[in-house]
């Protein structure tokens, strides 16, 4: 499989909010650090994407938590267009991922699904990509849903093939 690593697609989801900001900073000695931090209501979004060795694929932001119907819609609208025969879709053991409809759709493209063991997010390299995504989102400090979506779109373009290959 080492020679066929371009066939692997790691799928996962992560939460993003409009209150993401850096909680620490630096200032000159003797000066106080002043920065704005959100307070009050914020919007939560779910970001779903796949990681190949050459970049992020099928990114999708939704205004709801992940469930089976949303996962099936993600597979149909975002994932299927980027799948090739022989691809292996690797995902965590979330109950919403265990959809017969999604599995049939993936198999119809000649690909197949492989589930990670329970409670093992450290085996999914997309988690490292999500750490970078969230660090950039904190820097972007998006305070509206539209700004958050634009920031995510801009950040997805920052993932180089070399970087994704190293994950």
Which residues are covered by each model-predicted region?
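C-terminal anion-handling pockets and recognition modules
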Residues: 5-8, 126-167
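The start of beta-strands in P-loop NTPase/AAA+ ATPase cores
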Residues: 7, 87-88, 112
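Short, basic/hydrophobic alpha-helical segments
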Residues: 70-88
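Extended, low-complexity cationic-aromatic segments
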Residues: 1-76
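RNase H-like two-metal-ion nuclease catalytic core shared by retroviral integrases
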Residues: 92-93, 100, 114-138, 146
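Short, well-ordered coil/turn elements that cap or connect secondary structure elements
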Residues: 3, 84, 108-110
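Mobile genetic element proteins and their domesticated derivatives, centered on retroelements
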Residues: 10-12, 49, 75, 92, ...
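Short, aromatic/basic amphipathic alpha-helical patches
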Residues: 99-109
């Amino acid at each position: 499989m080492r020679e066929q690593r371009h066939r692997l697609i790691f799928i996962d989801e992560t939460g993003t909010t409009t209150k993401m900001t850096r909680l620490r900073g630096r200032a000159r000695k003797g000066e106080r650090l002043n920065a704005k931090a959100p307070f009050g209501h914020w919007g939560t979004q779910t970001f779903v994407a796949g990681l190949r060795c050459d970049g992020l694929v099928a990114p999708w932001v939704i205004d709801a938590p992940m469930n089976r119907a949303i996962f099936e819609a993600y597979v149909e609208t975002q994932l299927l267009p980027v799948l090739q025969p022989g691809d292996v879709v690797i995902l965590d053991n979330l109950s919403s991922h265990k959809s017969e409809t999604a599995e049939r759709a993936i198999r119809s493209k000649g690909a197949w699904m492989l589930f990670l063991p329970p409670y093992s997010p450290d085996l999914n390299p997309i988690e490292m990509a999500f750490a970078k995504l969230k660090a950039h989102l904190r820097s972007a400090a998006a305070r509206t849903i539209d700004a958050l979506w634009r920031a995510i779109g801009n950040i997805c373009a920052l993932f180089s093939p070399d970087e994704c290959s190293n994950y």
